[in-house]
Every structure is written in structure tokens, then in C-alpha cells.
């Protein structure tokens, strides 16, 4: 049987795990860990030759290819947004599928056998459109998504594996790159029950990065008179530096942001040099952290518990490593957070545990009881939303309600399904609609039409409408505007497989070209800036000729490019080594100058490569605002007059 893996499909970075020997184990990427400690940056790019790059290779080249690099596609899941890259259009599902395909491939290399199924996590506040889009992405990537579970639930599962016999209530504070989820759970006797969930799909580490970026850009504008926000390449470098500084300041009190040659004007090149302290960082991100408070308070209120009832606080997501975030959560709840769960790995490990239970690799009596995060209902006469399944209802679940016709001799009704907390239909998220037709003509209020909602363990919704008089029925699985048809999914899956084959063939060539371009940048910087006054004319000409030969061979086969690149590297190494030895012999003053030259040779390429794992893109999908009170029950007599639906069919009215 093919392995079932658990995947944390994140906004900035993704992670995956698999159960081995009864325990969840993190799956490494082929390239190893990267910025932030996760294996798979959620970055997709297309090279100038049209080659697909995913994960760390895509992140590394983003600084030189920002227009063809896509980040934070998760924030657009469930929407009709189109990404443009490499001269083509891509849906969010496709971009996410490339990431999942990369994870699948590296997982197979790690476990040494095929991986065909997966449990994928989503933010608790993802609506049905976003969940279905995530499932579609898995299908395109060649994965059978056996279950979609909420990220906080997965984290709780990882936390409770060895404590499942204890009765306790825990609060999971899941603060990721793009979303915030706060979940209150009750655990005991192997049962994990979600009591409530609250959150914000437009709040995350990305917003922190933006605050830091804005500060750096503003500081540089004031000092140098240059607006870096107008230069996409420079802004990408600033974004990476901002994320790096944010991570470093979780463990140190200050850090330096150094970006040489970030810009230039008539006076010459300009360097960005800025010292950022933890105090300044906390000042910048303080308002963002404060926006988490309502979600914590709402989750506690919905679960009908006070902070004193909470036994454990579990922190999930990269931003929760920040001392300011830990201090904030502690001040709101009155409790210190647990340290036994790695915030960057907990979600993937929890997903792997659930995958292991499904595959039979984990012997456990664990029962996972999730909830629906938003109220589900239908549109009725007057544009009023009639709720059927209230938010925080444990799933899987089923609920039905009887409605009637709104006008005499009505022969059809339109069932419009919505998700959200607002009393008016138009203020909620539309999930889809369908018609029940061929109803026998009858006075209004006589027909009895049963509308039934079924939600499976993945949170996917099926809706049925039945005329109880004739037993005629119509049903749908919610088809959102962003959901793909089976034919579209199959085509995209074939495209993904095609990309995989091409990527495998061209991988060596692309990596060699990236390596060559990076070293050319280093060599040019050495002879034009760092060592310009320290090398002989003959040495300068020699390196320039080597650079020219490498540039001319960039688009040629590896067997032509590799020797030229190795030759250039040898030349640069010989010259910088010679200069270092001379400087060392001249004493401390000369040694300092030689060290600078050697450091520039070894490190300049690192400044030019890499891209941030976060994006400031808008969040995809919208959660409805809080309800001002439940919709009142109406008798049949209140269904006065026809009011056509979007397709001209009258809407149902509430039954007496």
C-alpha cells in the first residue's frame, strides 16, 4: 500500500511528515532546510527558459526574476484570482499543486516507496470554496486527499499523542504566515473535540514583514532620497532581509540589515545599512499583534470557558517564536505557552498522525471531532439568510429543515447556499445554487420542501432539496465559482506530470545556469568595486574574459558551460588567495583590507540570491462578520409575493 503523508500547506512555507515506526517524522526537502526552518518554501517560479522551479530553487532566484515568481498563493485559494508568470495564466490551485507535487516527489525519495495519499491541513476559518480548492490542488498533484483537517486540530493532535488520556481544555494559537486561527479544544480518553474556533484569514507574519519593509524603505528614502518600492528587484531583496531580521530578533536583541549596491544614482552605487533592535521591531509589529486579541476572546466566549479553564496553551506557526507574541498571548490568557511542540512542525506532524491512523500505521483510539467554522444556510424570501448548521457544530453532521413555496402555483425553487454569520444573504459567502423543478402547481404554503445539509469529515458540503409530496429531489456537492471540473482537474494533472518530467530533465541545466549567473555577479562586483584598485590590469582583463566566456555559454549545454565556469572560479580563487596571503604578510592593517576582499569574494553572491517566504498579497476568501442574532422563524403567511432568484426562479419561503 502506498504511504499516506501529512502536509501543512502554508502561506510562506510548507512542511510534510510521515509516520515511521509509529512516530511522525518530518520529511526533508531535497535541498534541505531553508529560511525559517521549514523544508518547502511556498514559492513557485518560471525561469526565462520556461522551466518550473518550486520551493528553495524558486526562492533563491526570486531576486533576479520577481515578475515570474509567485508567493503566498494560499491567500488566493478559493478565489478566481489569476497569477501571471512565464507568459501564462495560472489558477491558485495550479500553483499550490506544484508545491504539493514537489512535496510528493521528495517524500517518495525519503520513504523509498510511492506516496499516493495525503492528509492536508487548512486554516480553521477556510470556507468551503477554499477547502475544495485545496483538495483540487492535491488531485492535480497526483494525490488522493483522504482528509482535509484544520491546522489547529492537527497541532493539537501532535501535542496530545502522548497525553490523550488526560482530560483537559487547551487553546491553540496558530499564527502563520497568512492566517490566524484560535481554537479551544477538549481532550481526554483519546477524543479530541473542537469546542470553538475563531480567527482572521487576513492576518499573519506577512503583515509583520510588510511593516518592517515599509520601515526600511522609508528610512532609506529619508537618508538617500531613493524609493526602493519602485524597484521590484531591490524590494525583493529588502523583503528577504526583513524576514531574516524578524527571525534573528527572536533570539538576539539587535541585528544589522546590510544590502550592498541596493540602488544607484548619478553619484554612484548606494548601500543599505541599518541596525534594527528588538525594541524597534516590537514597536513596528505591536499593532499587528494586538489585532489577535479579538480572536482569542471570541474563541473563549464561543466555547463558554474563561482563561482559568484552559490547562495548556499551544503555539503554532513561525511568528509565535517571537518573544513579543509569547508575551502577548500570556497576558491575554494568564498562562505561559507550552514548549513541547515545535511551532514550525506541529501541524505537519499532526496531519501525519491522522494519516497514520487512516493507513493503519498508528495504533490508536484517537477520535478527531472537528467543527464547521462558519454558519451554513440558504437564501430565503427578502434576501434573508436562514441558518441550517450553526458555526462550531461538530462534523461530520447532517441537518434538515422544511420550507414551502412563496407564491401560488410555483413550479420551481432556487436553493442558494451561503456561508457566514450575517443575517442578510448578500453579506455572506456564496457557495453555489441549484434548482428543484417540476413541482406540482399548488397554493403557496402547501408544498413541503425539505432542504438537507450534509458535511463530511473534510468539511465538504452536500445539499439536497426534496419535495416531500412527490419525493422528487435535486442535489449538489457545492460547486463554487473557483472549483474545477473533473476534466479541468485531469488536464491540469497531466500538465503537472508534464512539468515534472521536463523539470527532471532540465534540473541540472537550470541549477548550473543559476550557479553561473550568481558567480558572474560575484566576479563582476569584485573587479568593478571591491578589488578594483587592488588587482593588476592583467588580472582584471583575465577575469573579464572569463566572465564574458561564461555569459556566452549560459544558454548552452552543461558540458560547455561547466568547464568555463570552473575556469572562472579557479581564476578568482587564485587572485583572491594571492591577495589574502600578501595582506597577511603586511601586518594587521593589510590583513584587514585583505579580509574584506576575501569576504567579498565569498559572500557577495549570497546578497544577490534568495527571496522572502512571505507576500503581502490580499487574503483569499472572506469570513462573514459576527451575527447580530439568529434569524427569526417565519410562518408560511409571511412569504408574500414572488421574488426571483439569480436565474429567475422564485426563492423558497419558510414553512409554517
From Swiss-Prot:
It holds the Pfam family HSP70. PANTHER family: HEAT SHOCK PROTEIN 70KDA. Keywords: ATP-binding, Chaperone, Nucleotide-binding. Acts as a chaperone. One of its GO terms (molecular function) is ATP binding. Residues 590-605, 622-635 have a biased composition (Gly residues). CDD domains: ASKHA_NBD_HSP70_DnaK-like. It comes from the Archaea. Belongs to the heat shock protein 70 family. Residues 606-621 have a biased composition (Low complexity). This is Chaperone protein DnaK. The lineage of its organism: Archaea, Nitrososphaerota, Candidatus Cenarchaeales, Candidatus Cenarchaeaceae, Candidatus Cenarchaeum. It comes from Cenarchaeum symbiosum (strain A). Residues 590-656 are annotated as: Disordered. NCBIfam families: PRK00290.1, prok_dnaK.
Amino acid at each position: 500500500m502506498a504511504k499516506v503523508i501529512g502536509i501543512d500547506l502554508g502561506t510562506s512555507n510548507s512542511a510534510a511528515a510521515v509516520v515511521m515506526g509509529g512516530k511522525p517524522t518530518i520529511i526533508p526537502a531535497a535541498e534541505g532546510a531553508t529560511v525559517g526552518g521549514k523544508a518547502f518554501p511556498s514559492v513557485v517560479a518560471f525561469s526565462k527558459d520556461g522551466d518550473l522551479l518550486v520551493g528553495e530553487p524558486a526562492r533563491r532566484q526570486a531576486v533576479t526574476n520577481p515578475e515570474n515568481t509567485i508567493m503566498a498563493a494560499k491567500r488566493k485559494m478559493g478565489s478566481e484570482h489569476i497569477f501571471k508568470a512565464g507568459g501564462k495564466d495560472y489558477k491558485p490551485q495550479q500553483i499550490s499543486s506544484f508545491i504539493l507535487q514537489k512535496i510528493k516527489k521528495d517524500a517518495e525519495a525519503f520513504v523509498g516507496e510511492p506516496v499516493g495519499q495525503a492528509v492536508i491541513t487548512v486554516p480553521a476559518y477556510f470556507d468551503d470554496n477554499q477547502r475544495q480548492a485545496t483538495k483540487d490542488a492535491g488531485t492535480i498533484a497526483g494525490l488522493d486527499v483522504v482528509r482535509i483537517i484544520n491546522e489547529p486540530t492537527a497541532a493539537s493532535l501532535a501535542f496530545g499523542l502522548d497525553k490523550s488520556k488526560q482530560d483537559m481544555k487547551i487553546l491553540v494559537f496558530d499564527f502563520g504566515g497568512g492566517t490566524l486561527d484560535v481554537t479551544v479544544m477538549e481532550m481526554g480518553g483519546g477524543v479530541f473535540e473542537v469546542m470553538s474556533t475563531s480567527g482572521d484569514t487576513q492576518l499573519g507574519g506577512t503583515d509583520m514583514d510588510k511593516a518592517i519593509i515599509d520601515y526600511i524603505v522609508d528610512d532609506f528614502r529619508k537618508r538617500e532620497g531613493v524609493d526602493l518600492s519602485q524597484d521590484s528587484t531591490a524590494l525583493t531583496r529588502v523583503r528577504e532581509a526583513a524576514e531574516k531580521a524578524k527571525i534573528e530578533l527572536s533570539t538576539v536583541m539587535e541585528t544589522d540589515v546590510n544590502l550592498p549596491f541596493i540602488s544607484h544614482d548619478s553619484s554612484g552605487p548606494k548601500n543599505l545599512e541599518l541596525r534594527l533592535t528588538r525594541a524597534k521591531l516590537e514597536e513596528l509589529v505591536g499593532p499587528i499583534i494586538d489585532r489577535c486579541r479579538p480572536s482569542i476572546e471570541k474563541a473563549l466566549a464561543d466555547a463558554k470557558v474563561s482563561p482559568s479553564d484552559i490547562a495548556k496553551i499551544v503555539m503554532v506557526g513561525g511568528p509565535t517564536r517571537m518573544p513579543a507574541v509569547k508575551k502577548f498571548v500570556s497576558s491575554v490568557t494568564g498562562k505561559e505557552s507550552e514548549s513541547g511542540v515545535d511551532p514550525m512542525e506541529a501541524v505537519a506532524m499532526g496531519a501525519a498522525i491522522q494519516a497514520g491512523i487512516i493507513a493503519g500505521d498508528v495504533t490508536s483510539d484517537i477520535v478527531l471531532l472537528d467543527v464547521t467554522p462558519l454558519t451554513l444556510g440558504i437564501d430565503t424570501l427578502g434576501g434573508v439568510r436562514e441558518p441550517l448548521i450553526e458555526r462550531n457544530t461538530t462534523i461530520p453532521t447532517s441537518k434538515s429543515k422544511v420550507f414551502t413555496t412563496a407564491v401560488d402555483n410555483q413550479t420551481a425553487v432556487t436553493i442558494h447556499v451561503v456561508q457566514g454569520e450575517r443575517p442578510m444573504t448578500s453579506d455572506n459567502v456564496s457557495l453555489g445554487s441549484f434548482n428543484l423543478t417540476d413541482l406540482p402547481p399548488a397554493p403557496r404554503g402547501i408544498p413541503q420542501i425539505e432542504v438537507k445539509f450534509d458535511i463530511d469529515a473534510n468539511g465538504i458540503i452536500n445539499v439536497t432539496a426534496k419535495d416531500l409530496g412527490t419525493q422528487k429531489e435535486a442535489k449538489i456537492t457545492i460547486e463554487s465559482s473557483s472549483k474545477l471540473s473533473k476534466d479541468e482537474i485531469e488536464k491540469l494533472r497531466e500538465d503537472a506530470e508534464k512539468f515534472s518530467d521536463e523539470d527532471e530533465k532540465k534540473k541540472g541545466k537550470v541549477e548550473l545556469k543559476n550557479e553561473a549567473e550568481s558567480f558572474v555577479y560575484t566576479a563582476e562586483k569584485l573587479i568593478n568595486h571591491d578589488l578594483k584598485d587592488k588587482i593588476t590590469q592583467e588580472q582584471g582583463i583575465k577575469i573579464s574574459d572569463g566572465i564574458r566566456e561564461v555569459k556566452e555559454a549560459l544558454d548552452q549545454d552543461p558540458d560547455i558551460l561547466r568547464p568555463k565556469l570552473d575556469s572562472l572560479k579557479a581564476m578568482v580563487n587564485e587572485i583572491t588567495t594571492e591577495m589574502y596571503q600578501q595582506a597577511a604578510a603586511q601586518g594587521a592593517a593589510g590583513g584587514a583590507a585583505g579580509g574584506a576582499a576575501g569576504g567579498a569574494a565569498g559572500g557577495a553572491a549570497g546578497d544577490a540570491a534568495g527571496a522572502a517566504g512571505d507576500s503581502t498579497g490580499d487574503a483569499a476568501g472572506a469570513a462573514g462578520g459576527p451575527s447580530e442574532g439568529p434569524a427569526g422563524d417565519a410562518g408560511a403567511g409571511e412569504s408574500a409575493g414572488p421574488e426571483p432568484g439569480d436565474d429567475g426562479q422564485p426563492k423558497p419561503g419558510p414553512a409554517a
